[in-house]
Amino acid sequence: MDKTLLDLGTQPLVNNLFHTKQEALNATQYPMSSTIDNDLKIQLDTAIPSEELYMKYLYHSAVNKPYVYHCQKMWHSIKHLKHNTIIDVGGNDGTLLKAFRSQSTDPLKLINVDASASFREENLEAGIEYINDYFNEDLELPKADIITSTNVFQHTPGAEKFLAAVRKHLADTGVWVLEFPYTLRTFETLQFDQFYHEHYYYWLVTPLVKLFDKYGLRIINTEEQTIHGGTLRLWIAHKSHSNPTGAADEYLKAEKKFDFFGAADRM
């Protein structure tokens, strides 16, 4: 049974930049209320149509210098994996894939699948194939040695369609590197500003383990990062080509004990 967890009233879309105070005051506002279910899946009550959120998307990853540094560091975590073909989902202006290419001594086939048309030319100029579409299993893509999605999965109301796409496009022995603001840290530190309309889900490990299992996937490794107020990086593989590691166990225990309603009351 879903229960209201955090209600922040109504809010405008955060990536709209207004020229005047009056424009801002007249902006359309949408409900900003979230629920939690028995599996600790937290999501917004209201999903804003993707066309309103992303067709004229103003945010550029490259202006976020801590994120650029984060991308450069990520290469050192994954370079030991097979990495001939890498697909980045929601790769924006190509910041992550550019960081990989600049540090790799091997030729890389790099593909950015992004719903916004705003970044096509910038990616193509960098030698990155750009697929202007939502990540889905109907796309014609080569099997990926690595799929990356950094600060993207929580933006996706169609989480199960996303997982079906991972299952199809990830090579048998490939690894999906998933990053998201870790919601346990969000509540521990009362970061209410993580709640906005682009973030439809607020992920914990508990519901993800169940979702991954449904699509034949499992967590094989975890790393915590400081970016975005506390990010969890999960390494995910096909169950058919990986062994259980217990990597998620400590997170499952911590989430079961935590008082999310008490923290929400203090936000």
Task: Describe these PLM feature segments.
Residues 1-66, 223:
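N-terminal juxtadomain amphipathic helix
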Residues 83-92:
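Conserved class I S-adenosyl-L-methionine
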Residues 93-106:
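Conserved SAM-binding loop of SAM-dependent methyltransferases across substrates and taxa
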Residues 124-138:
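Conserved SAM-binding strand-loop segment of SAM-dependent methyltransferases
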Residues 148:
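A conserved beta-strand element that flanks and buttresses the S-adenosyl-L-methionine
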Residues 160-175:
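A short glycine-rich, Lys/Arg-flanked "PGG" loop and its adjoining helix->strand segment in the class I
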Residues 178-201, 205-207, 212:
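Short, glycine-/aromatic-enriched active-site segment of Class I SAM-dependent methyltransferases
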Residues 228-267:
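Flexible, glycine-/basic-rich loop-and-beta segments that form/coincide
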